[in-house]
């Protein structure tokens, strides 16, 4: 895997050039995430050296972030970079943005998000 060094004030990160996008997880017949297949997909990506994982609030009818939070629990948090996006269509105030950010932290079962888009 090739990596790009991302420099910022106070340090740098080596982020894989190829990321894992979580908008198209495998689905079961009822349209929900096939968690067994999706977890296997995540494991293959991480084992291949992918360390940038991207999701968003609305992916899979809102279930991508909660699933990803559960699935990533078995990996050390410092072994991957997590990206998600602010659902701007739900934001009418700074308070809305803050509330949604806290909600996304909870959904992802993490204390921080590396890249918030």
Language model regions located:
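Ser/Thr-centric signal marking residues that sit
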Residues: 55, 84, 110
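A short, structured active-site edge motif that brings together acidic residues
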Residues: 78-90, 115-117
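Short gly/ser-rich anion-binding loops that grip negatively charged ligand groups
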Residues: 54-58, 87-94
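Proline-rich low-complexity regions
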Residues: 16, 74, 87-88, 107
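Glycine/proline-rich, positively charged
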Residues: 29, 91-117
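N-terminal binding-site loop/beta-alpha segment at the start of enzyme catalytic domains
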Residues: 1-80
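Generic beta-strand or strand-like secondary-structure segments
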Residues: 67-70, 85, 96-103
